[in-house]
A protein has these predicted regions:
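Membrane-proximal intrinsically disordered regions of secretory-pathway and membrane-system proteins
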Residues: 1-431
């Protein structure tokens, strides 16, 4: 784990949302569009002056540093409001402590001149990942069953990014419930926090590079309960073979062929399992074992392809044989209504999984270059990839009737609850 990043996200949101302001959120923000556009023009010119000053003095000018901090904090408040991560209407000055989604920013300090000189070029990878997390303008959503390779066999595709997809789904949920689902709020907060770190790096507030690890960015956020589908593995193993990294795609071809063939059989099996679960109220044990192996294999396969793990995976999806493994529940009773409407209920989760897929591709793309140079994967990118794979595995497990617990979209791993002496009601996850 790296040392604490100087730019930290503060989350003091209570999840309550006003239905009226949620419905008209984009219209209510029109004055802010104008203000941030004007402020951004000023920041462009001020950043040039700050670059020259920092290059000459070895540290940023205090007055310009305060100006940049106010701008970054204001942009964070506005993004949180627009993407339903926060509820109150934000102010226009970027004052610290005035909004439930806030930032702690470092005071001006020494910065390396060589890093300052090449800042715009060094920032490009972080800006690429930030763009993918927020999404491409004009992006859309769709969800489909997919029998090809990748991180989820039932997945969505989206050019709209994690933050935008979470806001899109959260908009409907907030109108119905008057509350933002915690998982979606956490996902949006993560993307906004990474964007703030990227902006702070670009505008010379700090020379510490943005850190993509979700756990680091959401330290102040309470983790959800442990989902019955979760990943396990050695968090400290970042070693990557340069040779297999370079030839990762050709090496993956046998797994691609096998995954396609297994996916066809899995679709037939889940069709039969749907009827069994609908009438018996629980899945057939033999089909459950077959589909569990398939879902676990899909995770191993994607972890290898996207450089989240290093060894070449096996072809059988057996538990305990891969560094990044998947814990799956035993067959148990499932709600018949959830079973009957499973395909439709899975669509929101598939949309979000598709949005996370863009981040997974970007993280793998950047990891490929770093791993070739260093022989190891960046911890932050590896943890972001693990988050995307974990959520995709939960979507798969839900679609393939391994559990009727809905996927939880929080980037945080679940927290272990206290031991229970008596069985309790199964936890309900709303995204």
């Amino acid at each position: 784990m790296q040392a604490r990043h100087p730019v930290q996200l503060v989350v003091e949101d209570d999840l309550h949302r006003s239905r009226l302001t949620v419905f008209f959120r984009l219209l209510l923000a029109i004055p802010h569009y104008i203000w941030i556009a004007l402020w951004s023009v000023a920041v462009f010119f001020v950043s040039i002056v700050q670059w020259a000053y920092t290059l000459a003095a070895g540290h940023p000018a205090p007055a310009l540093h305060r100006f940049m901090c106010s701008y970054i904090r204001y942009a964070t408040h506005l993004e949180a409001y627009l993407h339903l991560v926060g509820n109150p209407y934000p102010g226009f000055t970027g004052e610290e402590g005035e909004y439930p989604i806030d930032l702690t920013l470092p005071p001006p300090g020494p910065q390396k001149r060589v890093v300052t000189f090449f800042r715009i070029f060094l920032a490009l990878p972080a800006l690429l990942l930030n763009t993918v997390l927020f999404g491409v303008p004009g992006g859309g959503f769709n969800a489909r069953a997919n029998s090809r390779g990748g991180n989820a066999s039932f997945q969505g595709s989206s050019s709209s990014g994690l933050v935008t997809a979470a806001a899109f789904l959260g908009w409907f949920a907030s109108l119905v419930q008057g509350r933002m689902p915690k998982g979606l709020r956490d996902a949006g907060a993560y993307g906004i926090g990474y964007g703030a770190q990227s902006l702070a790096y670009l505008l010379f507030v700090t020379d510490r590079y943005p850190y993509a690890d979700p756990t680091s960015l959401l330290q102040a956020v309470e983790p959800p309960a442990v989902h019955p589908v979760h990943i396990v593995g050695d968090a400290g193993d970042l070693r990557r073979s340069r040779l297999t990294v370079f030839f990762r795609l050709p090496l993956w071809i046998p797994h691609f062929v096998w995954l396609v063939l297994w996916s066809i059989a899995a679709l037939v099996a889940v069709f039969l399992q749907w009827w069994v679960t609908l009438f018996a109220g629980r899945p057939a044990a033999a089909l459950h074992r077959f589909l569990s192996r398939y879902v676990r294999y899909a995770l191993h396969n994607a972890a290898y392809l996207f450089l989240t793990a290093n060894p070449f995976p096996g072809f059988d999806g057996a538990p305990g044989r891969y560094p990044l493994d998947l814990v799956l529940p035993e067959p148990g009773r499932q709600n018949r209504w959830k079973t009957f409407f499973r395909l439709f209920l899975a669509i929101p989760a598939a949309i979000l999984s598709g949005a996370l897929g863009g981040s997974l591709f970007a993280a793998a793309f950047l990891t490929w270059f770093v791993a070739l140079v260093r022989g190891s994967a960046p911890e932050g990118l590896r943890n972001l990839s693990a988050y995307a794979l974990r959520y995709a595995a939960q979507v798969n497990a839900y679609f393939y009737l391994l559990t009727d617990v809905y996927p939880h979209s929080s980037p945080l791993e679940g927290a272990e609850s206290a031991p229970e002496s008596e069985p309790t009601a199964e936890p309900q996850y709303a995204w």
